[in-house]
Each structure stands twice: as structure tokens, then as C-alpha cells.
């Protein structure tokens, strides 16, 4: 009798356990499986993909991070400004820009302390909007933590040994200049005290349009420490800047992409700041979040229409 009761109890426990496993499996699949459908986007029609030009560091990092292989974009633009203007004026467009470029569009008097508030205001007033990627909003905090999927570094590169004024400027960038970097993107390290040796000379800098706004602030900040230095800035793109440094046509290059192996052999480089690639849509587009896979598939031409994503 006791053996029969024991078998009965064990059978009941086994059945209950099996039911619980089934329930967990059902709800687990619902919460961890495919993402929620997008809002109704049928009125948006065809997707207009906007890309940067070949040679752009932002494009290189975008393609690399997302494994974009096609990049037969509907429209190609040659600057961050053109990208934002195109997306802002086109309801069905999707594009990508440096997160720091959004900050640069704001009041020129922005400080590191009020950047978050002004970015929040920008999201309400601009004709374009940054959206979440994989459910994570791009911000200084998510860039520092690495939680945002499309983070990247900003570089200064140079050939050979730096002269006195170039060394002084680079020391400024990596110390007190980090406060200026923080006003636009995210500093590589905490700002520190800087004492210039007030070397005389001229420095020519060329390269990335994403890094250029940061460099403008660094040049202005350095002038208060060393008025004897003259620094010229030419905005092109990362590849052009790096090639110019290799040829000796400029003293320093700005790059918003990682250096290629052959470039690393020919140039020395420093990471001066952290940034991210923000995905931008026209402000009236109802979409607020896309996965990295969805973005990749859009640029790999898997989805001709916005409604195809669903």
C-alpha cells in the first residue's frame, strides 16, 4: 500500500513539473523570441536609404559593425550636415551620423554639464530624430558602458616624430583638452591639468568631418594656453586625412574609423575620444527602435518598403 501511494505521489509531481516546464517555455519564447512588430508604417512607402561616401570613416564603421555588404544606397551624401538635412526633409528616409554631430548642431555655447539637457531638447525640436538600437538609446552613458551597439573611437594619427609644438598640442588634447572633447562626444579619459611649453610653430590637420567639430574646439582651447602656435584645419574624410598624413601633406590626421593594418605600420596614433553612430529618421516616422539585424537588412536591400520589415 505504501509503495502504491509513493508511486502515485511521484507521478503527480512528475506531471506538475512537466506542466511548469511547458508554461515556462511558452512564456519564455514570448518574451525572448522575435521582437514586437513595428507600428503601422504602410504610409511611409519605399525605404530611402541614405549613406555616406566611400572614404568616410562613419560609413566604414557602419558597414563593419553591422556587416553591411551591399551599400547600394538610394542616396549618397558627402557630409554629416548633408545627411541630417536629407533625412530631415524626407519622411521615408533612414540614415546614420556620428552621435557627436547631433551635439554639434546645438547651441555653440554647449558645455559638458548641460549637453544631456540640450540633446533632450534637440530631440523635441529637430526635424530628425535618433532612434534606439536593440532597445538601447544612444547617450554618453551607454557609450561609456558599451551597452549601445554602434560605439567607436576617434583618432589623431601622425607620421614620424612630433616636433615641439605638435607634442605640446597632443599633450593638451590628452589632458585639459578632454574637457573640450566631452562637450561634443565622450572623452577618452578625465580632464587633467595642462601646462604648455608655449612652443612656436604651425600644425596642419586634415581628415574626418565627424572629428572636425571636436578638433575646432580643441584648437580654440589650446590657443588660450599657447597663443604662439598656429593650427590650420581642413575637413575632408578619414581616408583622405590618413593618406595626407602618410604622404606628408599634413602634420596630423583625424579619423573616425580604426586604422587599417598598413596605416598602422606607417602612422602613430592616439584615441582622443569615444563616440557612436546614431541611426536617424525623419521626426514624423513612427518607428522608435530598430534591431541591428533590421538595420543591416535594410541597407542590404532585403526590405524595399517599410512595411516589409513586419
Region locations from a protein language model:
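C-terminal motif of bacterial Sec signal peptides marking the signal peptidase cleavage site
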Residues: 27-31
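Exported/periplasmic ABC-transporter solute-binding proteins
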Residues: 32-310
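Sec-dependent N-terminal signal peptides
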Residues: 16-24
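Bacterial N-terminal signal peptides that target proteins for export
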Residues: 5-17
Amino acid at each position: 500500500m505504501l509503495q502504491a501511494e509513493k508511486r502515485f505521489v511521484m507521478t503527480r509531481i512528475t506531471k506538475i513539473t512537466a506542466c511548469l516546464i511547458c508554461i515556462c517555455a511558452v512564456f519564455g519564447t514570448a518574451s525572448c523570441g522575435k521582437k514586437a512588430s513595428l507600428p503601422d508604417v504602410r504610409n511611409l512607402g519605399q525605404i530611402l536609404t541614405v549613406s555616406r561616401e566611400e572614404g568616410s570613416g562613419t560609413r566604414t564603421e557602419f558597414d563593419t559593425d553591422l556587416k553591411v555588404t551591399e551599400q547600394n544606397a538610394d542616396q549618397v551624401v558627402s557630409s554629416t550636415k548633408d545627411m541630417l538635412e536629407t533625412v530631415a526633409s524626407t519622411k521615408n528616409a533612414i540614415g546614420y551620423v556620428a552621435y557627436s554631430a547631433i551635439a554639434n548642431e546645438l547651441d555653440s555655447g554647449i558645455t559638458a554639464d548641460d549637453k544631456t539637457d540640450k540633446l533632450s531638447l534637440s530631440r523635441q525640436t529637430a526635424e530628425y530624430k535618433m532612434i534606439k538600437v536593440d532597445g538601447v538609446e544612444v547617450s554618453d552613458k551607454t557609450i561609456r558602458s558599451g551597452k549601445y551597439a554602434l560605439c567607436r573611437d576617434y583618432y589623431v594619427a601622425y607620421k614620424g616624430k612630433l616636433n615641439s609644438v605638435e607634442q605640446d598640442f597632443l599633450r593638451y588634447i590628452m589632458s585639459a583638452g578632454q574637457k573640450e572633447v566631452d562637450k561634443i562626444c565622450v572623452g577618452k579619459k578625465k580632464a587633467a591639468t595642462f601646462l604648455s611649453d608655449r612652443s612656436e610653430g604651425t600644425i596642419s590637420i586634415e581628415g574626418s568631418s565627424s572629428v572636425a567639430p571636436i578638433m575646432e574646439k580643441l584648437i580654440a582651447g589650446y590657443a588660450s594656453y599657447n597663443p604662439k602656435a598656429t593650427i590650420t584645419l581642413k575637413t575632408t574624410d578619414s581616408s583622405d586625412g590618413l593618406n595626407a598624413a602618410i604622404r606628408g601633406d599634413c602634420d596630423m590626421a583625424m579619423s573616425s574609423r580604426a586604422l587599417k593594418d598598413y596605416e598602422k605600420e606607417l602612422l602613430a596614433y592616439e584615441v582622443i575620444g569615444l563616440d557612436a553612430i546614431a541611426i536617424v529618421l525623419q521626426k514624423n516616422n513612427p518607428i522608435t527602435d530598430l534591431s541591428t539585424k533590421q538595420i543591416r537588412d535594410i541597407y542590404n536591400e532585403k526590405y524595399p518598403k517599410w512595411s516589409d520589415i513586419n
